[in-house]
Amino acid sequence: MNQRIQYIAMIYKKHIGMGSASLGNDEASIFGFEVSPQYQGKGFGRAILKRILTDLKNRGRENITIEVDSTNKNAFNLYRKCGFEVETSFDYYRKRPDFLFQS
């Protein structure tokens, strides 16, 4: 059974971002990653994602994936800057492709 972890980022008791991870034996999948609009483009997303990645690696997960909508260029670029590489693209549910990244 996969374990799930919820990460919530706060500044002065104000929610600024969040993400979840599903943990398998030696892998993890990040989903639901978001940063509040007023905190985007200021380095918070990178800091939050790096913290999540560090925690997952400390838990022994080296194979980490995250999915992104192909039209979300800001998230796409953030994931690349954090060390993710495109593993595959797929187009279920929509006419535009999604990408699956792997760290």
Regions found by a protein language model. Give the residues of each.
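A conserved short alpha-helix in the GNAT/GCN5 acetyltransferase fold that borders
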Residues: Q40, L49-K57
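Conserved active-site alpha-helix within GNAT-family acetyltransferase domains
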Residues: K42, R46, S70-S89, R96, ...
